[in-house]
Design a protein with these regions (language model features):
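A structural boundary signal for the start of the first folded domain, especially the loop/turn
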Residues: 1-64, 69-147
């Protein structure tokens, strides 16, 4: 089974990309989703590594957020850059993870990802509202594979 290609349907991926685009219309923040078959690392360490490997730390306001999923491990992590991490309360990432986890446990992976994007978007909108000179600094596509 090709875990990366079969985890989400093409339509589900497009719904995720649409959710990212909608979220980024209201914030200067950047959100990405990355899928990997598996990892032998601790999930938070791997999410941080992938965040940097995808050059998400190059955003002007340090407000990128990565949703990282290791499919075979059935684990995921959310990594926020320094700018957003300094602004949100200490439970924000755990609350977002809990919302996603409930959907994942029900097998609703696309819904869980979209809800994670929406939750992240609300925080980004609050602390990093969209500005007239804002530009999309990172791809909105779901990235896949080992980096």
């Amino acid at each position: 089974m090709n875990y990366l290609e079969n985890f989400l349907t093409t339509d589900e991926e497009q719904e995720i990309v649409s959710a990212i685009r909608m979220a980024e219309k209201n914030t200067s923040g950047e959100i990405r989703v990355h899928l990997e078959r598996s990892t032998s690392e601790a999930i938070d360490s791997r999410a941080k590594y992938v965040f940097h490997a995808l050059k998400m730390d190059n955003t002007k306001l340090e407000n990128g957020v990565l949703i990282y999923i290791a499919i075979e491990n059935k684990k995921f992590g959310i990594y926020g850059d320094k700018g957003i991490d300094r602004k949100v309360d200490s439970n924000f990432w755990n609350k977002t993870r809990d919302v996603m986890q409930r959907h994942f446990e029900a097998g609703a992976f696309k819904t869980g990802i979209v809800e994670g994007i929406k939750s992240t978007s609300k925080a980004l909108e609050k602390f990093f509202p969209w500005e007239t000179n804002d530009k999309n600094e990172l791809s909105n596509e779901v990235s896949k594979g080992e980096v």
